Amino acid sequence: MSKKKKFVEAITPMDEDFAKWYTDIVKKAELVDYASVKGCMIIRPYGYAIWENIQKYLDTKFKETGHENVYMPMFIPESLLQKEKDHVEGFAPEVAWVTQGGNDTLAERLCVRPTSETLFCDHYAKIIQSHNDLPKKYNQWCSVVRWEKTTRPFLRTTEFLWQEGHTAHATAEESAKETIDMLNVYANFCENVLAIPVIKGQKTEKEKFAGAKATYTIESLMHDGKALQSGTSHNFGDNFSKAFNIQYNDKNSQLQYVHQTSWGVTTRLIGAIIMVHGDDSGLKLPPRIAPLQVVIVPIAQHKEGVLDKAEELRQRIAKVARVKVDSSDKMPGWKFNEYEMKGVPVRLEVGPKDIENNQVVLVRRDTREKIFVSMDELETKIPELLDEIHNSMLEHARTHRDEHTYTAKTLDEFKEIADTKPGFIKAMWCGDTACEEKLKEVAGVSSRCMPFEQEEITDKCICCGKEAKHMVYWGKAY
């Protein structure tokens, strides 16, 4: 095949093969390429630009809430990792080890960080002495390594980018508040920036983070009916501070253990954007996260005045949106398909007749709606339209989620829904891990969360018939 192969190629229809559709999108929209190391990915400029926008929005929120950025080493001594027993057991199967430096065998193995709790704890134990040193609210942007057996770009890779917040507080109440506050930051970001509706809730004992007192999550539903854990926030209580001896003198000069949290989101958010909003023509990017919000395509650009007018419009629109002119020598139809593939929210077409009529053709990526807009109105029309597109995409995603959320009152009903209707299943649970494991065995689903907004569907556990303690969202998940 020619190296100059056509950019715009047919995408496998999502209803035919969702996994292949997803792979086609990430490749053909030029988000990633596969790396030489199995399970790793090269994030290309367009994919990385989306991640940069995610970073920009979240980093601003973190700083507004009093957090500071730091950077920890990527290597963790084995002895440090083993200080918190539950934590090391939870990550042991995924850890990559460094055993040799140059030609010398290391005296102690070094773990390539799968997460950095132990490093932050070791640091906090050295710098926290007094109640005046608290709270400590740190965040780190970095990559982590988890030796995954099955990988897929953005969703599960051996190395991935993320942020991890780690905080230390004087009281249990403060750490509990921090955990929920940061979960709310994530939930608001998903809905107000990514146009992805989420369900907030607590993970079960079985599904919580290794070493945590409690784990909270935001869960979203993909187009194929599978759930995606889109962000987590963990309350450690004093579990880690006791293991690492992180103590401070309180106002009465009494030694107390700190209470800690950690919370994070990863590049899997890009996977969520693809799988919630994408269609058979490619990406469909929410305007607030799109690297390019408006593309101007000149029509008959060889004719006098067309490119000059396109550039004039670009300069005006640049005051209110991220915009570019595509003045390449490719055919307009090719450009239309390319920017649909890349999910650019708004396309403007401008040619000799449009200039004569002082108008442009405006096409929305989300609905394919085509309208004529006066050139004089673009600076006010574009921001309004971008907000309208965001709201429309959020509502569309929420409708899809709600239409694929089912309620089960009996085990037979639960199994039938799990077998025939992809989506969330709401059902009551007694709180026993044995019932949770049985539901996974008989229906192939996992508990996604115990939502903060509880409902009493019945008063009996869907599995054993004993008294129910929680309503749980269940589903198949990435």
Swiss-Prot record:
Belongs to the class-II aminoacyl-tRNA synthetase family. ProS type 3 subfamily. GO terms for molecular function: ATP binding; catalytic activity, acting on a protein; proline-tRNA ligase activity; transferase activity. It comes from the Bacteria. One of its GO terms (biological process) is prolyl-tRNA aminoacylation. It is an enzyme of class 6 (ligase). This is Proline--tRNA ligase. It comes from Clostridium novyi (strain NT). Catalyzes the attachment of proline to tRNA(Pro) in a two-step reaction: proline is first activated by ATP to form Pro-AMP and then transferred to the acceptor end of tRNA(Pro). InterPro entries: aa-tRNA-synt_IIb, aa-tRNA-synth_II, aa-tRNA-synth_II/BPL/LPL, Anticodon-bd, Anticodon-bd_dom_sf, Pro-tRNA-ligase_IIa, Pro-tRNA-ligase_IIa_arc-type, Pro-tRNA_ligase_II_C. Transmembrane segments: none annotated. It is found in: Cytoplasm.
